[in-house]
Amino acid sequence: MAGPLPLGDPAPTDGRLPDDLPIDPAVPFSAYLHVPFCRVRCGYCDFNTYTSSELRGAKQEDYASTLITEIDLAERVLSDAGALRPMDTVFFGGGTPTLLPPGDLARMLDAAASAFGLSAGAEVTVEANPDTVTPEVARTLAAAGVTRLSIGMQSAVPHVLHALDRTHRPENVRTAVDAARDAGLAVSVDLIYGAPGESLADWEASLDAALALDSDHISAYALIIEDGTKLARQIRRGEVPEPSDDLQADMYELADARLAAAGFDWYEVSNWARSDDQRSRHNLAYWRGSDWWGFGPGAHSHVAGLRWWNVKHPAAYAQRLAAAESPAAGTERPDDDARMLEQVLLLSRLAEGIAVADLPPANRARVAGLIADGLVDAAAAVRGRVRLTLRGRLLADAVVRELTD
């Protein structure tokens, strides 16, 4: 299970936004729709997801109708606040959204589009496990307005998939990608590196397999051991080795080199795309501080500097909405200093970087030291921007600390 919700102020039961919220209708608006169901809990995962035995009476078949109730609430709240505007991006995440019938995903998307509108050329992404994507599923999603499928490949090596508790076979990824392509969908694949027992050769095999798929976008994430997960307990008991930082660094450098050679450009520390048009616009909205409403249990939202998050369990979420109450559990409104620090954290991960002028004034002189250490690109700094080098990407957290402490 994921950890406790963040601290914050109580959220209004009717979901209303503060009257003094500085709404800017020019800021792009996105929607995140959380589908919290999984057949099996992966040993490394601490996301807010639930297997069938953990639902405590919540019914998967009722979920679409329940989430649409929150969409109706959001339409009223945003309309009252003068913040209603079309969605630039929509993202179905999880969990495993494709465990729901594709018709349910289509209903939720249609409800959101009816409530808020959908911008011309909007990006609509659905996350999927490879073994849940069939030609029929892909065609139904495409017909509903989905434009992009993000497929959880993670690895092409069977023993690595086993270490991660993934249920699909490597060959299922090709089947899923082909189904998505035949339906006219753009394709992104997710990889994880640094799993217990994974060698550099294993990782290279996964990169080769991912590149052979001819996808539009590849994400590669270092395995992080989260407290409370099965994998964390296995490491603590000495059953599996802890990931090696040095090996993970070697894996990242290999990924960057192989992806660049294949025509992919990095645009965020863990993300590469074949072209600017294939970047994840939804994730860029998060990193650039746009507005979004997160629907579903445990989902987080952000509008004009206000943040809130929903109750975590699907049963509690459904009970709140059945009582005509907002499912929000808490809210917070960070001050200007906190928002500046978060901006540094997020924008510094992007290839476009962050303007030196947007750093805390007392820390701007530190950029010279980061250049000398090979962490920040000197040419970008001349243009007034902080842009990470390859070494800087490997040590991104340390760079952020230097720029914000």
Report residues per predicted region.
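Local cysteine-cluster metal-coordination motifs and their immediate loop/turn environment
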Residues: 34-49
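Flexible, acidic/Gly-rich N-terminal and inter-domain linker regions that tether
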Residues: 1-32, 39, 378
